[in-house]
Amino acid sequence: MTRKKVREHLFKMLFLLDFYPKTELDDQVSTYLSDIGNDADAAEETQERLEKVREELKQKFYAVAEHLEEIDRKIEEKSNGWSLKRLAKADITALRLAIYEIQYDEDVPAGVAVNESVELAKVYGTDKSPAFVKGVLGSVVRDGAEE
């Protein structure tokens, strides 16, 4: 499974954050993870590789959830007066994923995090989502470079 596909699975998992109470998230994550491997993209994967992917997704999902308040504050700060309530859920999810990768995941270069989140916004967001996501993330990256 490609890194891009793994990131897309993480995006879909993170999308759950706004639709389920915290008490149900563990069950929702388990259900989602158990379905990985049942699609055509994973048909060629070994069970060992699928287990590694599932574990990585689970770890990253909970890492994002742990930093969610900080990440959401950063989104509101950088989205020029737009509250999270006014933003499209797909845009919020793409931003959460990228900001997590930029600020907390040393294995992902900032440019890759930005580009991949813009691509996710193209697929799952509105026509205006890619430009919005790129603008917010550009501001986040610039701030990080200044620190």
Model segments located where?
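N-terminal interaction/assembly modules
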Residues: 1-130, 134-147
